[in-house]
Amino acid sequence: MAERPEDLNLPNAVITRIIKEALPDGVNISKEARSAISRAASVFVLYATSCANNFAMKGKRKTLNASDVLSAMEEMEFQRFVTPLKEALEAYRREQKGKKEASEQKKKDKDKKTDSEEQDKSRDEDNDEDEERLEEEEQNEEEEVDN
């Protein structure tokens, strides 16, 4: 847990980036206004987390999940954000699923490559053994001819 109230503030760089993305080009914001928005955002996050935690506790869980956050948004009377949040959550889940599938495919491809390399190595070893046998047979034949 935070030891000082300042520890609860969101990073200034993040707040500044969000503000710049939200404002039209050419619009500036004072340091004081940026600080006020930062504090307001921090309070909002803390309040939303507290509300979501209440839903988790009702469900006898210690871990907050997305449905807790969505329920908290409704309880805080931010219903108009629920649909965009659900859409963002679905996009996030699709992205994570795609990453997971890509990772699994990469692992399968790597395993196939490793298996193929092992088969090639085994074939090479078999060929080396065959060559050694042929050389040995040739030497034996030469020795027999000499005898």
UniProtKB/Swiss-Prot annotation:
Stretches for region Disordered: 93-147
Pfam families named among the record's database cross-references: CBFD_NFYB_HMF
UniProt feature coiled coil, ranges: 85-146
Keywords carried by this UniProt record: Acetylation, Coiled coil, DNA-binding, Nucleus, Phosphoprotein
Keyword Transferase carried by entry: no
GO MF: chromatin DNA binding; DNA-directed DNA polymerase activity; protein heterodimerization activity
Ranges annotated as biased composition (Acidic residues): 125-147
Modified residues (N-acetylalanine): A2
UniProt tissue specificity: Expressed in heart, brain, placenta, lung, liver, skeletal muscle, kidney and pancreas.
Gene Ontology cellular component annotations, sorted alphabetically: ATAC complex; CHRAC; epsilon DNA polymerase complex; nucleoplasm; nucleus; pericentric heterochromatin
Organism domain of life: Eukaryota
Residue numbers of Phosphoserine PTMs: S122
Cellular compartments annotated: Nucleus
Ranges of biased composition (kind: Basic and acidic residues): 93-124
Metal-binding recorded as keyword: no
InterPro entries the UniProt entry points to: CBFA_NFYB_domain, DNA_Pol-Epsilon_Subunit, Histone-fold
Residue numbers of Phosphothreonine PTMs: T83
Function (record text): Accessory component of the DNA polymerase epsilon complex. Participates in DNA repair and in chromosomal DNA replication. Forms a complex with CHRAC1 and binds naked DNA, which is then incorporated into chromatin, aided by the nucleosome-remodeling activity of ISWI/SNF2H and ACF1. Does not enhance nucleosome sliding activity of the ACF-5 ISWI chromatin remodeling complex.
Oligomer status and interactors: Component of the DNA polymerase epsilon complex consisting of four subunits: the catalytic subunit POLE and the accessory subunits POLE2, POLE3 and POLE4. Interaction with POLE4 is a prerequisite for further binding with POLE and POLE2. Heterodimer with CHRAC1; binds to DNA. Component of the CHRAC ISWI chromatin remodeling complex at least composed of SMARCA5/SNF2H, BAZ1A/ACF1, CHRAC1 and POLE3; the complex preferentially binds DNA through the CHRAC1-POLE3 heterodimer and possesses ATP-dependent nucleosome-remodeling activity.
Protein name from the UniProt record: DNA polymerase epsilon subunit 3
Origin organism lineage: Eukaryota, Metazoa, Chordata, Craniata, Vertebrata
Name of the gene encoding the protein in the UniProt record: POLE3
